Amino acid sequence: MSEFLDIVNENGLPTGRIVERSVAQMEGIWHRTSHVWLVRRKKETVQVLLQKRTAFKSFPGCYDISSAGHIPAGEGFLPSALRELKEELGVSAKAEELICCGDRTIIWDDVFFGKEYHDRQYTRVFVLWKDMEEKDFFLQPEEVDGVRWIDLELCIHNVKENLFPHCIELPELLMVRDVASKSPLAVKQA
């Protein structure tokens, strides 16, 4: 079944036209995505949840954003983010629990499974504080091979130094750190 996306302008606003997802990624047409990073306090540190992508996705076997997805035509950033959390990780959340880190653009040109890929995303990035154990997530097997909590600062270091297989962009991870560090939940309560 085809998935249709809103074509957006440079400000992430729908133009009133739609495009098939595969065409958007083949031709480099701008569309929207939502990214949600789950974070939690563990002892003295803030941890971030990474998902491991399946072998059948682009960037197979790489660690990635906790939950992310393309926004279907007619849907907004928040509903899409909440839907993807539920589908990929089995996590239910309310819109008011998501903390917006900001918007960013992603331009990515590559070849996956022998096909050219020209991705142009206008992305809204969110943080969700969620203290769950890895075993308590209900993973979507077509999308996610597993999940792993990692100290946020260690994750930033490992991404900078490319010390593990990942498709995480450092500027986005720094956005997450900035927002998470300002939250009262980031500070250990006395």
List each language-model region with its residue ranges:
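Acidic, metal-coordinating catalytic segment for phosphate/diphosphate chemistry
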Residues: 1-44
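Conserved hydrophobic "DFG−1" position in protein kinase catalytic cores
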Residues: 7, 38, 50, 127-128, ...
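Short loop segments at secondary-structure junctions
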Residues: 11, 40-43, 54, 129-133, ...
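Short, well-ordered strand-loop elements centered on a beta-strand within folded domains, enriched
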Residues: 14-18, 44-52, 135-139
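Nudix hydrolase/Nudix homology domain
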Residues: 22, 61-63, 67, 73, ...
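Conserved Nudix-box catalytic region and its N-terminal flanking loop in Nudix hydrolases
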Residues: 23-34, 44-83, 87
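A short coil-to-beta-strand element that immediately follows conserved catalytic motifs
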Residues: 92-103
